[in-house]
């Protein structure tokens, strides 16, 4: 009789813990994570080995910002489980705390359980980048691409790393693969423009910057700056003016853009106007060497020699 009652109690506890789990999910669905956590704890009081409840608790704690307690839950789960998702999530939490070695160990364990777990591969790639382990990152990208050949972020990360390492032709091959998969991928087009500019193919680089701005409506300030610089290089002053004004609407406090505006007027021999904008650039950034040199040059053209010499000296002191 006692054994029967014990079994009935165990069954009752399991059913009640499931009820609490459902209740927890209902509150979670409404966005009430604290109440959801309360019912998860109730479920775990009745059934301490209820791994799914522990997993949901770990996720809720992480969302609420209690990373350490979330880690405790996941460590408890992974201590006697081969759940690749739990290891991947645990790795993410270690990464948030800056513990990259532990994070990488968790990703390895996750991939040891399921070697084609693309999410774990991607998280590992990101962690390797933050850890400065670039050769391993490239190898990991290749493995990820072998399992998920259409996964664009892997190509983008690989291309960017190859670019940083000076392996430009390989980087271009990765970028071109992305553009085969997604013709107007802005990250890939931006990387292609950067690489083309770096290897001296400036006219082609400008075409890609123009595509980003004029066709794809990209308003990244770095893209605009590069487009302005190359527009000047090829004496496309109308384009340069258009991009300068676009940039200043976004960042009126950007000294480089005011310098470019001064340069535009100097190229048109409007020296007083050029001087005004060079002064604006220097006001925003007193040590802007290019603006100081440009101002000195314009003052010299205007016959204001003493001021010009003073400005040259300021520039040379930097």
From Swiss-Prot:
UniProt keyword annotations, A-Z: Repeat, TPR repeat
TPR repeats: 17-50, 84-117, 119-151, 152-185, 186-219, 221-254, 255-288, 289-318
PROSITE patterns: TPR, TPR_REGION
Keyword Repeat: yes
InterPro entries: TPR-like_helical_dom_sf, TPR_rpt
Gene3D superfamilies: Tetratricopeptide repeat domain
Superkingdom of this protein's organism: Archaea
This protein's record includes keyword Mitochondrion: no
Name of the featured protein: TPR repeat-containing protein MJ0940
Source organism of the structure: Methanocaldococcus jannaschii (strain ATCC 43067 / DSM 2661 / JAL-1 / JCM 10045 / NBRC 100440) (Methanococcus jannaschii)
């Amino acid at each position: 009789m006692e054994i029967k009652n014990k079994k009935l109690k165990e069954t009752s506890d399991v059913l009640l813990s499931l009820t609490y789990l459902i209740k927890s999910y209902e509150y979670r669905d409404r966005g009430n994570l604290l109440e959801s956590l309360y019912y998860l704890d109730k479920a775990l009081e009745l059934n301490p080995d209820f791994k799914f409840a522990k997993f949901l608790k770990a996720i809720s704690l992480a969302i609420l910002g209690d990373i350490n307690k979330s880690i405790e839950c996941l460590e408890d789960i992974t201590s006697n489980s081969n759940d690749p998702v739990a290891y991947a999530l645990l790795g993410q939490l270690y990464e948030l705390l800056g513990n990259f070695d532990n994070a990488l160990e968790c990703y390895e364990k996750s991939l040891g359980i399921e070697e084609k777990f693309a999410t774990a591969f991607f998280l590992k790639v990101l962690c390797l980048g933050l850890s400065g382990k670039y050769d391993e990152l490239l190898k990991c990208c290749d493995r990820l691409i072998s399992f998920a050949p259409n996964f664009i972020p892997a190509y983008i990360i690989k291309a960017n790393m190859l670019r940083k390492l000076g392996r430009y032709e390989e980087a271009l091959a990765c970028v071109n693969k992305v553009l085969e998969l997604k013709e107007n991928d802005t990250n890939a087009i931006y990387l292609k423009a950067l690489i083309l500019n770096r290897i001296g193919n400036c006219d082609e680089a400008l075409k890609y910057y123009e595509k980003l701005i004029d066709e794809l409506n990209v308003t990244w300030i770095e893209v605009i700056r590069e487009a302005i610089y190359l527009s000047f290089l090829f004496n496309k002053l109308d384009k340069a003016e258009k991009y300068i004004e676009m940039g200043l609407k976004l960042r009126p406090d950007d000294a480089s853009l005011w310098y470019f505006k001064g340069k535009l007027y100097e190229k048109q021999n409007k020296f007083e106007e050029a001087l005004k904008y060079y002064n604006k650039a220097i006001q925003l950034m007193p040590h802007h060497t290019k603006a100081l040199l440009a101002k000195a040059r314009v003052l010299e053209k205007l016959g204001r020699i003493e001021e010009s010499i003073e400005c040259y000296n300021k520039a040379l002191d930097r």
